[in-house]
Design a protein with these regions (language model features):
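Helix-loop-helix junctions within the multi-pass membrane cores of secondary transporters/permeases
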Residues: 12, 85-176
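Pore-lining transmembrane helices
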Residues: 15, 22-117, 153
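Hydrophobic alpha-helical segments embedded in the membrane of multi-pass proteins
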Residues: 36, 159, 174-186, 201, ...
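Alpha-helical transmembrane segments of multipass membrane proteins
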Residues: 39-43, 60, 70, 127, ...
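Membrane-helix interface "capping/anchor" motifs
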Residues: 189-199
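Conserved small/polar residues in nucleotide/adenosyl-binding loops
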Residues: 218-220
């Protein structure tokens, strides 16, 4: 009796799993950056005397990076909704333009669109604009997992930093300078990379003008 050989093709992984596998390598640079910044943020929040869970809560609900550094100090000051609103608007206004740029890209993905809009950070915006999912990978799930992984990196690193802040044997004074240092390095890299320094100078001038304008409004 002749036996017919049958070739059984292996089952393909679930579309979500394929998208997750494709998205993870795209987010490794973000993981490296968020790990350092998140640790600094968590240690900073802990040094202010706030609860260990606070940086994780703000990373989940606010997820605003530099805004979270400012909010941590605002929580210890006098209650001033107008000041908090103006400060948040000044820091995060760029996300209004991010959202406009991503309207078509995020269209048609149901509940995932709402989450991706909420959790769109600078780094996530950059990746989702430039990265292309491999063949056979659902684009919606691909962008969703990029967004989710980036936020998980930040929340986890902030929580770890807060936990370490409770046991660190040295003073954490000055750790809030980490964000200033990061933006200084970005400015210097931009200055060295481009022969034309117009964009770097604009990036330096705009925050200074906004700082003067918003501070004058706050103290009116």
């Amino acid at each position: 009796m002749q036996h017919l050989s049958r070739t059984v093709s292996p089952a393909l992984p679930h579309p979500c799993l394929r998208a997750l596998r494709a998205a993870f390598p795209q987010t490794i640079p973000v993981l490296a950056g968020y790990f350092v910044l998140g640790l600094g943020y968590g240690i900073y929040v802990q040094s202010l005397g706030l609860p260990v869970w606070m940086p994780m809560l703000m990373g989940t609900v606010v997820y605003g990076g530099s805004l979270e550094f400012v909010l941590a100090s605002l929580l210890l000051g006098a209650f001033s909704p107008l000041s908090a609103f103006l400060m948040a608007l000044m820091i995060q206004a760029r996300h209004l333009f991010y959202g406009l740029a991503m309207l078509e890209r995020y269209k048609g993905y149901g509940w995932r669109s709402f989450y991706m809009i909420f959790a769109m950070s600078d780094e996530t915006f950059s990746i989702t604009c430039s990265a292309t999912p491999p063949e056979g990978v659902d684009k919606g799930w691909f962008m969703f997992f990029i967004t989710l992984l980036d936020q998980l990196y930040w929340v986890g690193s902030a929580g770890l930093g807060a936990a370490l802040g409770t046991v660190l044997p040295f003073s954490t004074e000055g750790v809030d300078f980490v964000m200033t240092a990061m933006f200084t390095v970005i400015f210097l890299n931009q200055w060295e990379k481009d022969q034309q320094h117009g964009s770097a100078l604009i990036g330096l001038a705009v925050p200074l003008v906004c700082l003067m304008v918003f501070l004058s409004l706050i103290h009116i």
